[in-house]
Each structure stands twice: as C-alpha cells, then as structure tokens.
Amino acid sequence: MKDFRVVFSLILLTVFILGCTQPAQPTQPQPEEKIKVGVLIPETGLYSSAGVAMKNAAELAAEHAGNVELVFADCGDSPEKAKTAFEYLVSQKVDAVVGAYSSPQAMVVADAAGENKVVYLVSVASTGVIEKKVTEGNRYVFRTAYNTTYWGVLAAEFLSLSKPDKYYFVGYDPLKTFNQGMLAKINELYGEPELEVYYKSPSVSPDDYKNVAKQIAERAGERDAIILGDPGGVSINFLKEYRANGGKGIIYSVGGALALPATLKKLNAGYTAFQAAALEETEKTDLTAKYFADYKAKFGEDANNYAGLLTYDSIMILSQAFEKGGKEKLIETLESGSFKGAAGIYRFNENHQALWGSEELKGTIGEFVNGKVEVVYPPEFATSQVVWPE
C-alpha cells in the first residue's frame, strides 16, 4: 500500500509539472469596440453639393478617430426624406446620428431622435427651435453648428471691420427663414440694410438670380458691401452676374461654395469675403492642419466647406465622448465635457448648443484678395485688414 501511495504521488507530481510547463495558448485579440454613427447627408436635391463635402469629411473623421463605424443615409432636401433616412439609420442600430442640412429637416429629425432615444448632433441647421426642443425636455439633441444668432454676429463683425458706406442683404428664398433670422441679429448689432432682397431657386425661376444681381449692381457703390445669404452653387452664378453687370464693393458670403480658394481663384473673385468655421491658416487645434491637409490629399480639393468641417468635428466629438464615457453615457459626457475639433474646443451650454463665440471656439472670416485668402477675423489669426477695391 505504501508503494502504491508513492507511485501515485509521483504520477500526480509529474502531471502537475507537465501542466505548468505547457506553452500558454495564444489569446485571440479582441476587436476594438466602436461607436456606430449614422450620417444624414443630402446626396440628392437642392443641397447635394454640400452633401459631397459632408460625406468626404465623415469618412476622414472615421479614419482619424479609429473607433467609429459609419452608416450613411440620403436625407435629400425635405423633412420627409430626412425622417425616412433617420428611421433607416435607427433600423441599423446606430448609437448616434449627425447631419441633415436644412432647419426643417433638423427639426423633424430632432423629434424622431427623442422618440427613439438616439443622440443626434445637428451639424448644419441653425434654427432656434433646436434649442427650444432641448429646454422642453429633449435631451438627445445637441448642436455643434452655429445657431442663427451667431451667423448674424459674424456678418455684423465683418461690417464693423469693413465699415462700408451702405450694405445690401441678398438672401436665397429656399433658406429665407435662416436668412431672416441672421439679418435680425445684424440689424440689432450693426443696423439695417439699404435693401433686403431674395432670389429664387433656378428650378423655380431660372433667371431670378440674374435679375437680383443686376438690380444690386445698379445701386451699390464702391464702398458698399453685399451680404450674400446663399451657401450653395447658385451663389457662384450670382457673383459672376453681379461683377459682369459692373457690381462694385465687397461681397460677403455665408460660405459654402464661395469659401473654396480653388473656386475663388478660378473665378478671379477678388474682394470676396466669407465666413468659415476654420481656415487652413487658423491652427486652432492640432486637428486643424491635419483636417485640411488630409482632406486635400484624400479627395483632391480644398476643405473649406462649412457643412463638411462641422460634420467632421461632430463625428470627432462623438468619438471622444464614447472614449471618455462609453455608449451608455453619451448624453452625460457631452453635457459635461470638452471636445477637440478642427474648428476649436467644443463645450455645450444648458441648451446643448456649442459655445460659438467663446475664447476657444470662434468662427473665421477670410477675404480673397490678390490671388489668395487673407484672414481678417478673429484678430489672433488675422493676416490682413479688410481690403477694398481701389
């Protein structure tokens, strides 16, 4: 019996030693968890030119972030299409949504976001209704874009810097609500225009922008400014028609199509000023230069489109919020945190509006003159004063 116990003990010891010396099985690397972000882009309809920039910027953001999976949906140019696109994104089980273009679209999507309990970052639309929805209890909605008031603040800033004899306000009829809200703030901060006029979409009235351009060109003087409230491609045609009819002074654009240096060079559009969330010359964070350089390298064109840059920043914000607090605490993290984008450092107020106008997040005004873009605002990045035609 004693011998049996000795043999049994030796067997156990051998098994134990062999077990300890067996090579460990390699563990399979766990795939990195990602936040699934739905992106509403206007691939069709009135705003399709902005849709291209928005999609490009979203893809670049996912590449830079590394922890984002994208799902795209075409929101077209109507609230109905935007809602259908949002519902598709929800069916794809996204964790958050960014995008849509117009204010009517964003309002419908904001309601749907609250109903479906999906975080929604408004990256373009400016209506004050968005903030009102938050105060009424919809905590799922945040806005990274300017509100309508800040669009007016920037235009008034340009007028204060340029000191024109008079200014004219030319709006775009499909965006009349936005334009009128912006103008109300300009009136408050600077004063009323010599004339307020709107041109219709070419799909409704093909020659209307030509008629308005001629009307303003006949009235505006050498030291007058034209505030142009159309960010789309028709603004290019308006500018060409205005100058062809002898239009003088400076045109200040809300950006978009007339904020692209390549376009301005091609048009030889000297004395055209514009707003942008950021410019390549304004290194607000370490993402600014990276965004502009990588966008141009990847897509072969300039990245000054406002809707594109704000789409990029919105996705980068969601990436950082996910990294800080996870999917379950997106709202709490967005409400309390600060987030880095190409345009600056984002924080949100009690109405979930990004704090544009704060020290770390300011819009930018550039002027195309002598073949290049000069920064005229904010002062810490200014490379020139406003230049008038001689």
Give the label of every model feature segment.
Residues 38-57, 73-79, 101-102, 172-177, ...:
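Extracytoplasmic "Venus flytrap"
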Residues 113, 118, 179-277:
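Extracellular/periplasmic bilobed ligand-binding domains
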Residues 239-312, 379-389:
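Extracellular/periplasmic periplasmic-binding protein-like sensory domains
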Residues 49-54, 64-132, 144, 201-207, ...:
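Beta-alpha junction/loop-to-helix N-cap segments that form part of ligand/metal-binding clefts
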Residues 82, 143-168, 208-209, 235, ...:
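Hydrophobic alpha-helical segments within soluble ligand-binding/sensing domains
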Residues 298-305, 319-375:
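Segments of small-molecule ligand-sensing domains
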Residues 43, 62, 138-204:
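An alpha-beta-alpha
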Residues 1-30:
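Secretory targeting signatures
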